């Protein structure tokens, strides 16, 4: 009887969610059992106060499970194949090709429910209790399933991250550990719902002071904010879609890409991201000059446009940013004026001297205006692309035809049309005959005359054949964009020639010194010998030793 009382009390402590079982067990208890239960009641109340709110009941659990069964299955993770025949012109809308379901669920949730054990009952408890209990294999797999896998990190890096000290395994490994273990993992809670449950208090209101709304785009709304701790201004972007409504990892590509890219002078800097109120929040660098599109609109209103020197400056700086992105194994795929941002350097900023410049990008650190690439929502990997079409006005034809062999050249095509718009070209067509006319290599009409070299470079950037377009690295070292590069090369050749002459003179001087050194040593020795012999001869004639003189005189 004592063992029965202990087991019943333990089961009552471990499973609060099964209220019906507790009611039935209380109805079958004897008077002695009731007395034992009453003696254990204060301990139960204390545990409830320490552990927080009671988890959902069985009815609520059944409702949530049935909802998960109705959610989409593994088809969510497969890319939708295009139509049998590639379109000849883009459609009017620029929506994603991939389906966007309203309810999200991992593929494993579509399978049957396994038997619920005591360990699974413990997993439904609060996170505070889980930290106080020993971690089991199920807990480790649960926490692993809640970790996002960044598609832009190398496979070896991900394995090193997840196999630290041989304790953590990749998802592929977990799927191959057998049917029994896979069944236990199949009914794990969805990653996104867990992130919502563990969401902290409003970080946005706690850490930032909102100044104004500065932009609204496809991703969401951007606010200008001051961080309360450091007093600096940041651009806080809040997603329009709810986090639970995001269809797939493409919606998180901006976070993934920013996290991998790191810091570059010509890419908008990324600081942090988090989930708040079921929306993705991204903390980025604030560019005080706004977007290039806003500057173009102001120029159009005043019947003024960027002149060739400024156009070259924009093209060169964005080429440096694209070169960095492409060298990182990614492409942007949505280059356009609204995704290029301007930073005006403050007067208090000190310029960087030549001795501090470590790369070609540092040449512009002392420039008064910096141009940066932002909005990496369409970024994808070059080796394993998952392409989502950007703005059709700047879209290369090969992307429309789903030819992804030369993805970096699609960014070059879009950059060429971006410079055309900045130079004064009218609004680019979304589709139709004019759209195809530009894709045949015809540069849009502009209201100003450009030099032949620069115009030829821009026209080559929108060449119909992707292979014929220059790379971002080639643009970054183009003599057309570097007006002083030819003169610099000439001065560098003269400097190298003078260095060669100086080195030759040094070698000849060293050789001459080496020849003169033995002669000086011979003359010095001869002088010392002659001086010593002369001293002996003179001393012998003039004066005898004092002891000998005294001895002679005494005799």
Curated annotation (Swiss-Prot):
Describe the task this protein carries out. Answer: Oocyte-specific protein tyrosine kinase that phosphorylates and inhibits CDK1 and acts as a key regulator of meiosis during both prophase I and metaphase II. Required to maintain meiotic arrest in oocytes during the germinal vesicle (GV) stage, a long period of quiescence at dictyate prophase I, by phosphorylating CDK1 at 'Tyr-15', leading to inhibit CDK1 activity and prevent meiotic reentry. Also required for metaphase II exit during egg activation by phosphorylating CDK1 at 'Tyr-15', to ensure exit from meiosis in oocytes and promote pronuclear formation.
Quote the InterPro entries the UniProt record gives.
Answer: CC_SR_Kinase, Kinase-like_dom_sf, Prot_kinase_dom, Protein_kinase_ATP_BS, Ser/Thr_kinase_AS, Wee1-like_protein_kinase
Q: Name one GO biological process term.
A: positive regulation of phosphorylation
Q: Name one Pfam family in it.
A: Pkinase
| Enzyme kind, highest EC tier | transferase
Catalytic function, reaction form: L-tyrosyl-[protein] + ATP = O-phospho-L-tyrosyl-[protein] + ADP + H(+)
- Tell me how the protein is altered or processed after translation: Phosphorylated by PKA at Ser-15 in vitro, leading to activate kinase activity. Phosphorylation at Ser-15 by CaMK2, leading to increase its activity and promote metaphase II exit during egg activation.
The segment(s) forming the Protein kinase domain are 208-485
Compartments, as annotated in UniProt? Cytoplasm; Nucleus
Name the keywords, alphabetized: ATP-binding, Coiled coil, Cytoplasm, Kinase, Magnesium, Meiosis, Metal-binding, Nucleotide-binding, Nucleus, Phosphoprotein, Transferase, Tyrosine-protein kinase
Which annotated residues bind ATP?
214-222, 237
Annotated GO molecular function terms are: ATP binding; magnesium ion binding; non-membrane spanning protein tyrosine kinase activity; protein tyrosine kinase activity
The residues that hold Mg(2+) are 339, 375
| Outcome when changing residue 311 to A | Abolishes the cytoplasmic localization
What is the name of the protein in this document?
Wee1-like protein kinase 2
Q: State its Enzyme Commission number(s).
A: 2.7.10.2
> Has the keyword Signal been applied to this entry?
no
Residues annotated as the enzyme's active site:
334 (proton acceptor)
């Amino acid at each position: 009887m004592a063992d029965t009382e202990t087991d019943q009390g333990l089961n009552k402590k471990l499973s609060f969610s099964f209220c019906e079982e507790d009611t039935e067990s209380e109805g079958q208890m004897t008077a002695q059992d009731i007395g034992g239960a009453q003696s254990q009641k204060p301990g139960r109340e204390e545990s409830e106060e320490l552990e927080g709110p009671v988890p959902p009941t069985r009815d609520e659990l059944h409702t949530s499970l049935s909802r998960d069964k109705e959610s989409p299955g593994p088809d969510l993770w497969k890319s939708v194949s295009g139509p049998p025949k590639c379109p000849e012109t883009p459609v009017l809308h620029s929506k994603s090709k991939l389906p966007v379901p309203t309810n999200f669920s991992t593929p494993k949730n579509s399978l049957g429910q396994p038997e619920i054990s005591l360990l699974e009952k413990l997993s439904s408890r609060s996170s505070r209790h889980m930290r106080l209990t020993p971690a089991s294999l199920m807990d480790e797999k649960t926490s692993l399933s809640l970790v996002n896998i960044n598609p832009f990190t190398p496979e070896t890096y991900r394995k090193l991250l997840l196999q630290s000290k041989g304790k953590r395994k990749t998802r592929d490994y977990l799927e191959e550990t057998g049917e029994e273990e896979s069944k236990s993992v199949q009914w794990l809670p969805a990653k996104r719902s867990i992130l919502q449950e563990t969401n902290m208090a409003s970080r946005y209101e706690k850490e930032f002071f909102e100044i104004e709304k500065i932009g609204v785009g496809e991703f969401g709304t951007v606010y200008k904010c001051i961080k309360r701790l450091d007093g600096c201004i940041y651009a806080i972007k809040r997603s329009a879609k709810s986090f639970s409504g995001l269809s797939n990892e493409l919606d998180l590509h901006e976070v993934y890409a920013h996290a991998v890219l790191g810091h570059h002078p010509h890419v908008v800097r990324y600081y942090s991201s988090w989930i708040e109120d079921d929306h993705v929040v991204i903390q980025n660098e604030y560019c005080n000059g706004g977007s290039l599109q806003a500057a173009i609109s102001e120029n159009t209103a005043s019947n003024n446009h960027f002149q060739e020197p400024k156009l070259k400056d924009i093209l060169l700086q964005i080429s440096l940013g694209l070169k960095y992105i492409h060298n990182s194994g990614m492409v942007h795929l949505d280059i356009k004026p609204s995704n290029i941002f301007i930073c005006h350097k403050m007067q208090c900023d000190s310029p960087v001297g030549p001795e501090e410049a470590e790369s070609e990008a540092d040449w512009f650190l002392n420039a008064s205006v910096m141009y940066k690439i932002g909005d990496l929502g369409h970024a994808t990997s070059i080796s394993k692309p998952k392409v989502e079409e950007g703005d059709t006005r700047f879209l290369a034809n090969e992307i429309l035809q789903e030819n992804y062999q030369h993805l970096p050249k699609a960014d070059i095509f879009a950059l060429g049309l971006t410079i055309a718009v900045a130079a004064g070209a009218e609004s680019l067509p979304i589709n139709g005959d004019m759209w195809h006319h530009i894709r045949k290599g015809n540069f849009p009409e502009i209201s100003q005359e450009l030099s032949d070299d620069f115009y030829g470079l821009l026209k080559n950037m929108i060449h119909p054949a992707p292979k014929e377009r220059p790379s971002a690295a080639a643009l970054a070292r183009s003599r057309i964009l570097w007006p002083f590069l030819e003169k610099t090369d000439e001065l560098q050749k003269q400097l190298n020639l003078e260095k060669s002459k100086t080195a030759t003179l040094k070698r000849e001087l060293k050789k001459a010194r080496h020849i003169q050194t033995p002669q000086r040593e011979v003359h010095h020795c001869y002088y010392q010998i002659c001086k010593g012999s002369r001293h002996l001869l003179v001393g012998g004639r003039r004066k005898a030793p004092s002891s000998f003189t005294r001895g002679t005189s005494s005799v």
